[in-house]
């Protein structure tokens, strides 16, 4: 599931920070504590610290505006410094037909040959277009968990207004999750996302191990195009 929201009002993040919780924002994974990040986020897809370093190198400072993103990272803690929530997101250009049928996209791609920004939007999103899966960690056992989620939503809304984005997207949530009601009460609506594939990597622990289970053709592509 993803949540989308079009917002027109302005909110000050100062009004969302309370005495017993605080939110920290960074613009690169290299400014995040590696051990803390990996403790809570590493098990979710390619979201470990080194994986985000790779994504930043691949999708920052590019001449192609569709592959040039701004990254941001949030950590919310209680007054004792205990982590309540961690997440990351990106700001970039999305094609409006990403969830449309193939025939619709083909027609639009023909138009984009001469008008690249045709039917595109500036989007703030949890995660990025390269990733799938749970893009945030919340310590649900803490009493302050719900307030931490609401503070995150306030901060994202402020960023949405500051950047004059067209859309704010929270993704990817399980169909039934703890924060459904909280998020929808903030004005978001649900959008069904395409099915994804999860590969259980129990049989390999390294790139070399993984390449051994590939076909000769796939192994050649992996070694030449992916590993570098």
Show where each model-derived region lies.
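N-acyltransferase acceptor-side catalytic subdomain
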Residues: 1-228
